Structure formats: structure tokens, C-alpha cells
Amino acid sequence: MSLKHFLNTQDWSRAELDALLTQAALFKRNKLGSELKGKSIALVFFNPSMRTRTSFELGAFQLGGHAVVLQPGKDAWPIEFNLGTVMDGDTEEHIAEVARVLGRYVDLIGVRAFPKFVDWSKDREDQVLKSFAKYSPVPVINMETITHPCQELAHALALQEHFGTQDLRGKKYVLTWTYHPKPLNTAVANSALTIATRMGMDVTLLCPTPDYILDQRYMDWAAQNVVESGGSLQVSHDIDSAYAGADVVYAKSWGALPFFGNWEPEKPIRDQYQHFIVDERKMALTNNGVFSHCLPLRRNVKATDAVMDSPNCIAIDEAENRLHVQKAIMAALASQAGIGNRE
């Protein structure tokens, strides 16, 4: 049997994702379990985290397991990922050894590695995550690289809870770009587009100009999901028409890919669109829609205080659900035949 990882949700069937969400809902009602008893996970962070680290550490503990946090370049050796490299620079270990050694110690490996924001053609290859999956003898979990599949499931669960059903078909879903003073990763936007179309919703990607449309890979995933799950997909640059009648508004900021690695000329363009902030006027156009965001969020930059403090904001519910869906993911991966068997 081939080893199953959790690198992105497109690799999992809809039935498998539904099973994870069902299990996550059960974990939400019953916090403690023994699914990871005697098992461990290495959480490898190349970038900072609050929710991801906290929820994975606590999730492993609540299921009877143990988490070890590693930060290469800080409390662990810097890692080389290119084959054939003469390692006479800053890196001390090659991923071929790192992943295999960790796999002898632990039962799961989580990886968080953001793009370097220099060359999108390289960053979109997701080298760090794919290298861990290539060499690791145990399942690897994407804790956010160029997608954020754990956030996807937390978001989906929050929507199912709010609407009181697992069937989200027919809901109008707006994924809106919002302003941020810095160009940010497209990971959460890629993932939101993916899961919303996977759930069969009518999805509108709202962004200022065509330069802010997401990478074609994720647009293609979304189009494929529309065919398989129903729903629809459109791109809009018109704020009012996009918000009109929306059931869900999901906000995220990201840098324009044509300027990737050359951000200076992108900034004055981005600065023109600060009015994309999610505010009461825009939310009033919706169908009493819910608002959410992956967090962290800069108040009164991405969304106003009034929107964040509204009873229609489910961002905190979504953040809580990170704990529950990640427990479901860890439990499912650790249950594979041979995982945890050191004999």
C-alpha cells in the first residue's frame, strides 16, 4: 500500500474529506482520545506560527501523542534541498537524511515553509514540502506552504456548522482580495478557492485587476471541481456586484504574481485598492452573509472592527476548528498500516 500524505486536498477524494470533517466534528464534541497513543509527530517550522503550532501540539497531546517542534536554522541545522549541490555553504544537512532520520523517530511529520517571494516559477514547485514527502518513510502534513489544506478543512467545517448542513451547494461564496501593506503568500487564497469549489458552491474570485488572479494551477483545480461537484466559478473586479447576495465572504490579501520577486512597482498598484477593505457597507449587500478570515488579520486594513466584531464573523470558529480538523488528519494518517511499527 502506498503511503498517504496530506499535501493538498485535491489528492483526497470528496468522500475522504467528508470523513475527515465528520471525525473533526466528533473530536470537537469529545476532546480527548487515544488515536495517537504511543505515537509522535515532528513539526518542522521554517516560518513563524501561532495557531498552527499551538493547535498541532495540543491536538497530538489530546489524542495521547507527543509533538516535537523543530525550526531549521534556529534550533536545528539548516537543510539543503537541491540534489548535486556541493554543500560548502550555510546548509549542514541534506533533506535526504533529515526526512529519513526523522521518519525513524516519529510517526508523522508536519512541514510549514512559505515561498521565498523571489521567483514564483521555483516557489510554485513547493520543493520543501515535496522533498519531505519524497524521502520520508512516514506521512507528511502540509502546515502551509503554497497551499494551506488544514485551513481549508477548518473553514469548511465552520461553514457547515453555521449553515447546519454538510451540503453547501447553492451558496454564493466570495473570495475577496483585501489590501495589506506587504505582498503576502497566495496559499490561503489558493486553498479557499479549492475547497469552496470542491464543496459545490457558486464561487466568485473578487480582485482588483487581472494581475491579482491566482496561479493557473489553482484556477484549473477550481474549474475541475466545478465540473465534478457542481456550482460555478467566475472572476470579478466589481466590488458591489460580487458582494450582492453573497452567503459567504472570505477575505485574504496576496501579492500580484506578475510582480513576484519585483515587488517595488507592485506596491503603488496595491496601494490604490485600499478600498477593498471588508466593511459594513459591503457586507450589507450580502444575503446576511457570514465573514471569515484565516487570521492573523490587521483590523481596519483588511476588515473593519465592525465586521470583525459582528455576530456574522466566524473567523474565531474557523480558528478553533484548526485543532479539530488537524486531530482528524493526524488520526487518519497514523492509522495507516505499518505506521508506528518499529519492529
UniProtKB/Swiss-Prot annotation:
Main subcellular location: cytoplasm
Annotated family: Belongs to the aspartate/ornithine carbamoyltransferase superfamily. AOTCase family.
Annotated N(2)-acetyl-L-ornithine binding sites: 144, 252, 295
Localization per record: Cytoplasm
Pathway given in the UniProt record: Amino-acid biosynthesis; L-arginine biosynthesis
In-chain residues carrying the UniProt-annotated modification N6-carboxylysine: 302
Gene: argF'
Pfam families: OTCace, OTCace_N
Entry's Gene Ontology cellular component terms: cytoplasm
Name of the protein in its database record: N-acetylornithine carbamoyltransferase
